[in-house]
Amino acid sequence: MNVIVNTENAPKPIGPYSQAIKNENFLIISGQIPIDVKSGKIPNNISEQTYIVLKNIKSIIIASKYTIQDIIKITVFTTNLEKIHIINEIYEKFFIDNKSSFPTRSCIEVQKLPKNVKIEMEAMAFKK
């Protein structure tokens, strides 16, 4: 049975979709863009955008009663793969700071993302 997850600690969906769905042991998190929940603003640089996206994913993970260690897959969409070294730096620090191993990951360059952001990530978690 699907259980919809919504939290005020992550941006509201900008379209007709849920922040996340829990189904038995799986948690599927919709693509998150770097909207700061408190201010509603989107920073300009890729490092801040990456950090906010990961922070938003963490908020959904916590609201779902999962942990960062439960994340098994992340898909990164970016408008500029030449900035992957910056994304990787923030990404690596996030998982180390949360005492987690690195989940599997794919990185895909796209022409454009919603609200003209530079990065979006979706995630999947599994918990026994």
Curated annotation (Swiss-Prot):
PANTHER family: 2-IMINOBUTANOATE/2-IMINOPROPANOATE DEAMINASE RIDA (PTHR11803), 2-IMINOBUTANOATE_2-IMINOPROPANOATE DEAMINASE (PTHR11803:SF39)
Pfam families: Ribonuc_L-PSP
Family: Belongs to the RutC family.
Record-level Gene Ontology MF annotations: deaminase activity
Record's protein name: RutC family protein BUsg_359
Domain of life: Bacteria
Coiled coil: none
Entries under InterPro entries matching the protein: RidA, RutC-like_sf, YjgF/YER057c/UK114
Organism: Buchnera aphidicola subsp. Schizaphis graminum (strain Sg)
Record GO cellular component, one term: cytosol
